[in-house]
Amino acid sequence: SIIINEERFEKELTPKGVKMPETWDDLLDPNYKDVFVWANPTTAGGAYIATACQIFRLGEDAAWDYLKTLDQNVHHYYKGAGDVISPVATGEFIASIAWAHDSFKIQQQGYPLKLIIPKQTAYEIGGSAIIKGGPNTENAKVFIDWLLTKEAQELSVATSYRYPVRTDVAAPAGLPTLEEVDLVDYDRDQAASMKEAVLEKFDAEIISNRA
């Protein structure tokens, strides 16, 4: 999601005629220069997914043009995907890109944080697994089975605001349902296979070229 500190936005950007962003392309507005932060895709998985999202959304050449233009607005890059939320929530910066569920959790604590889920957005599927040959395999199986119960899924929604995998468990209250989200055609296999090359290029052509 795009996250915005509403108080600073209304105080500093609204008077300039800037409208609340609705699309990925809205973040290219030069008015976001130095008030926008992001996580480094080479160190943050969530930022890589957002990077891959642009490639799937725009095609490779246009995506790199987009990322290089967006970089002109980036004050600096953080190491972790979640590291950007607090600086925006507290008003140190105005805007960023961050996981919706993590940002929503901070918003629920009373911060003036607005979440925008733009069209053609990406996603990740959280997973749990049993380690082959590990200790306590039977207990691990019991735990995995429990994770998939309605009780566990409702607990996950209530505490982490993550979307459930069960259709009989509702999405987090206050967030759109998955059916209401316009998802990009995100090819997970391609995202994995191109990751090394994309990150090398991001580091060489964007991170290494920053003043």
Regions found by a protein language model. Give the residues of each.
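Short amphipathic alpha-helical coupling segments at ligand-binding clamshell hinges
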Residues: 62, 66, 135-147, 155-158
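Short secondary-structure boundary segments
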Residues: 6, 40, 100-101, 159-160
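A ligand-binding cleft/hinge motif common to bilobed small-molecule-binding domains
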Residues: 89, 93-112
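A bilobed periplasmic-binding-protein/Venus flytrap-type ligand-binding module shared by bacterial periplasmic
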Residues: 3-8, 51-52, 125-137, 155-156
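Extracytoplasmic ligand-binding site segments that recognize negatively charged/polar headgroups
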Residues: 1-92
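Extracellular/periplasmic bilobal clamshell ligand-binding domains
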Residues: 173-211
